[in-house]
Amino acid sequence: MTDSTRRQFLRSLGVATAAAAVRPRLAFAQEVRVRTVAGTGVAGYEPEGSGGLVATQTPVNNPYGIVAGPDGALYFCEVDTGRTRRMDLGTGRLTTVAGNGEAAYTGDGGPALAASFSAPHEIRFDRDGHLFVVERDAHVVRRVDAQTRVVSTVAGTGEAGFSGDDGPATEAQLRQPHSIAFVANGDLLICDIGNGRVRRVNMRNSTISTLSGTGERRAPTPDTGPLDGTPLRGPRSLDTDSDGNAYLVLREGNAVYRLDTGAGRLQRIAGTGEQGMTGDGGPGSTATFNGPKGIAYSASDHSLYIVDTENHAIRRMSLATGIIDTVLGTGERGDGPDGDPSQCRLARPHGVFTHAGVVYVTDSENHRVRALEGVL
């Protein structure tokens, strides 16, 4: 989902390690701090009732994908329970909007709260306000209708494989899809990581095709090349901007690529392909990552926020200057403390999203959602 689409939604509503010690400190116009907005640090689930529970006093369980909804609330999915949770940013209360807590692929044609979801990795809203969930272990993408709350499958058969290009998306096979995003024309992109491809669903006629990738999972991805016929080494996560670009994180490739969907070209813009945590204060193209698994484009500062998962950090690369820095995390695994983001340890974060001047992060194995304030 693009930032312009999010703004259109919301307008109508009115709504330190040694390594860290040598990193350049960033200068911001206001105080920068990180705080926990959901979760207690212990995995679990408590029934919320009709009024919800205070998010900071309520356990969550391995949160992954995160996004702001058309109602201005924060939504995130829990990979272990299959639930999608909603946090009201005004009241700070947490409710469940999809998933019954069972890991399975059931419930199409019925209400979202009665459906089972299997390892949801990411969630997005389309421009009509429908919620989309990508399920790694069910090998599908499903939709929760904005009005009826009824669940339906939009891509995948529930069986792992690769088939169906140029035909109906619901008759095509995916293999461990991890990430989804919408491009400006409304089409849905899917990181079909088990097939080494990015798939594209034409949402006007519900057909699927391969946008990029060849299925050669171990082949290196060149620095530049055509989208068609170029191998992708671990296409893990993507986000889009309003200019027709998609930004793709390669997990095994330890790099970020820009996919120009109009010109049909890709280009490496961050990461050398080597594992590491270097390059802060310099060009993103010479930096190193370690198993990056999430990305968000921010129109507010024309930057990419990259979840450097195995480095337990959030990196930011300005698309205007190309410079990269670490904005949250020390490079070592831990749990907090809240406050100074350069001293706050994370534990394998997976999701990131920017909304209303705040960077939200799913600190997955700490079972928390954190908010980074003052960087936008």
Predicted regions and their residues:
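Short loop/turn segments immediately following the C-termini of beta-strands
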Residues: V79, R136, I193, R251, ...
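Conserved beta-propeller blade signature
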Residues: A73-Y75, H130-F132, D187-L189, N245-L248, ...
